[in-house]
């Protein structure tokens, strides 16, 4: 009853930003990476497909990685990804910034340098075009910061506003990162706090502050460029970014071993833990829970913490694994640079449950 009630409230809302065009958030399950098709459904679909694969493709969708990699020569590869979704914020300019930051992140997560992007636009016929202009302006500003050239795109009429980008970059063949390979003894670190969807849910029904909402926007519009620049100095076992499948969902892709998650180390966005305590969770978070909860042992009762760990992130941080000595140096350097990185946990030998929250 509570879940259905919240879903109905959250998914038919109109927000107005200060001096900005109106965005209509008529969403089935809310916007951003919260809209992703569930882990189980997507895995079931992809396992039955067998697409043609060129020999130059060294990383494809079969690895559930952040982007595909196409080997150009012995030195360098092309890395490419696309992301798009519906609105989840009240300000069109912010929406463009978030969508672009999120799309570019996949290139950083592979160790690459983004070079150019193509816009993906879905926009209702007859809607105020000033809204679209502001979305595109937001994307332009993020791409300018990332030194990414917007070089074209495609637009169609649609019932709902959607925006994203196809981003292309380059990566040296000996510097490609993947989301696999974390080993026993490695430590996981995440570069951004968790709880974005929870804050958005709470804000949409007036249950969290404007300050918390603004902090969530800041989190989603911070490029992973700066964290990636630091990481390139170190030896890493596994790298990905945390988005729609939540922290546990993306951890699940990084190792075949088990992971102890350090509950006391988890960094929450302001207002997210309180939102979870008030049952203001999202449809995407509940999909993640259903797909993954059988793999998780919680050694103490903390429902709100559970929801944060399953919460879908839009434009989340880089999640990486490294040996302890490397992890300590990376964490120190990131903190000195103002990056709010924190320990997530450590890889241990495989146990009955893949994840243990301690």
Identify the residue ranges that each predicted region occupies.
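A generic local secondary-structure boundary/capping motif
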Residues: 57-59, 67-70, 106-108, 140, ...
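Glycine-rich anion-binding loops of enzyme active sites
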Residues: 72-88, 113-208, 346
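Short, well-ordered amphipathic alpha-helical segments that serve as non-catalytic structural scaffolds
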Residues: 97-107, 138-142, 146, 223-227
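Glycine-/charge-enriched secondary-structure boundary and capping motifs
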Residues: 9-30, 41, 125-149, 158-161, ...
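Short, compositionally biased
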Residues: 200-216, 337-340
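Active-site glycine-rich loop that binds ribose-phosphate moieties when present
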Residues: 166-175, 211-231
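N-terminal glycine-rich phosphate/pyrophosphate-binding loops that anchor nucleotide-derived ligands
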Residues: 15-109, 148, 183-188, 193, ...
């Amino acid at each position: 009853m509570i879940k259905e009630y919240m879903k109905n409230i959250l998914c038919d809302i109109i927000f107005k930003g200060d001096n900005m065009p109106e965005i209509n958030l008529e969403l089935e399950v809310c916007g951003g990476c919260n809209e992703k098709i569930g882990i189980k459904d997507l895995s079931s679909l992809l396992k039955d497909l067998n697409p043609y694969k060129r020999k130059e493709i060294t990383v494809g969708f079969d690895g559930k990685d952040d982007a595909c990699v196409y080997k150009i020569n012995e030195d360098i590869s092309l890395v490419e990804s696309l992301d798009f979704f519906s609105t989840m914020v009240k300000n069109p300019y912010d929406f463009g910034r978030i969508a672009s930051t999120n799309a570019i992140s996949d290139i950083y997560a592979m160790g690459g340098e983004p070079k150019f992007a193509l816009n993906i636009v879905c926009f209702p016929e007859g809607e105020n075009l000033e809204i679209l202009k502001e979305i595109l302006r937001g994307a332009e500003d993020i791409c300018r910061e990332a030194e990414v050239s917007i070089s074209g795109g495609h637009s169609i009429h649609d019932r709902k506003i959607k925006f994203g980008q196809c981003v292309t970059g380059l990566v040296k063949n000996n510097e490609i990162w993947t989301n696999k390979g974390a080993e026993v003894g490695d430590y996981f670190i995440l570069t951004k706090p968790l709880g974005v969807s929870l804050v958005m849910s709470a804000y949409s029904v007036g249950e969290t502050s404007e300050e918390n909402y603004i902090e969530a926007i800041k989190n989603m519009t911070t490029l992973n460029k700066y964290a990636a620049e630091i990481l390139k100095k170190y030896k890493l076992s596994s790298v990905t970014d945390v988005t729609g499948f939540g922290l546990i969902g993306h951890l699940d892709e990084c190792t075949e071993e088990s992971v102890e998650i350090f509950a006391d180390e988890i960094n929450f966005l302001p207002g997210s833990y309180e939102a979870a305590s008030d049952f203001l969770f999202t449809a995407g978070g509940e999909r993640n829970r259903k797909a993954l909860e059988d793999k998780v042992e919680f050694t103490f009762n903390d429902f709100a913490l559970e929801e944060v760990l399953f919460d879908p992130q839009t434009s989340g941080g880089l999640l990486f694994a490294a040996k302890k000595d490397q992890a300590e140096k990376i964490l120190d350097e990131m903190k000195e640079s103002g990056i709010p990185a924190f320990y997530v946990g450590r890889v241990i030998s495989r146990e009955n449950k893949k994840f243990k929250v301690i």
